[in-house]
A protein has these predicted regions:
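Short polybasic amphipathic segments
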Residues: 18-21, 87-90, 97-99, 173-182
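Surface loops and adjacent helix of pleckstrin homology
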Residues: 33, 101-102, 152, 188
Length: 191
């Protein structure tokens, strides 16, 4: 069940030219044109295959320089854990230019002065109905009906940025559109 929905979403990500992510009244757009969605199913049958567990996400590296707008992260963030309050991230030309909220300064400190660390590196969708929000992003990002973005590196999964850092931020029940097709709303996949 997890693998099947993960593959469907991965295919939709691959086919899409644009993604629109909406949460808490904020809207973020990004190009996915010619990028390949990746299914993280947790099923590894071939020698050399790898992943992290628990698994259950479909993800993609958005086109560098394409992210525009704002998004509200209201779950957890790698390096911080469960957020004290929602965190608003502002993007221009593919790069996070501001982080507003009680944990904003901590996030900016984690990213440091390296400009590539602020690259919008990933868009992902959680597909694991057994995963739970714990404050540990490796599980939180897999929770069914969530979405996440990441900042920093994406060169290991189809992107072009090697920043030496990769931090994911989880949204609990956003809306996600792929080329005007609604695929996620109110914590439920629309596939």
């Amino acid at each position: 069940k997890i693998a099947a929905r993960t593959h469907i979403l991965s295919d939709l990500l691959t086919q899409a030219k644009e993604a629109v992510l909406i949460n808490g009244g904020a809207r973020l757009t990004m190009s996915l044109d010619k990028r390949k969605g990746i299914p993280s199913t947790g099923i590894y049958h071939k020698k050399g295959q790898a992943g992290n567990l628990p698994s259950g996400e479909a993800y993609i590296a958005p086109v560098e320089g394409s992210a525009e707008g704002e998004i509200i992260i209201d779950g957890s963030f790698a390096g911080i854990g469960t957020l004290q309050a929602p965190l608003k991230l502002v993007f221009a030309q593919g790069v996070m230019v501001d982080a507003v909220g009680p944990d904003g300064d901590e996030l900016l400190s984690l990213l440091g002065d390296e400009p590539l660390a602020r690259n919008l590196a990933e868009l992902g969708i959680g597909t694991n109905d057994k995963a739970r929000v714990t404050g540990v992003v490796l599980e939180d990002e897999k929770v069914y009906g969530t979405a996440h973005i990441a900042l920093g590196s994406n060169d290991t999964f189809g992107g072009q940025v090697a920043a030496g850092i990769h931090l994911d931020g989880v949204m609990m029940a956003p809306e996600l559109y792929l080329d005007d097709r609604l695929v996620l709303q109110d914590g439920e996949l629309q596939i």
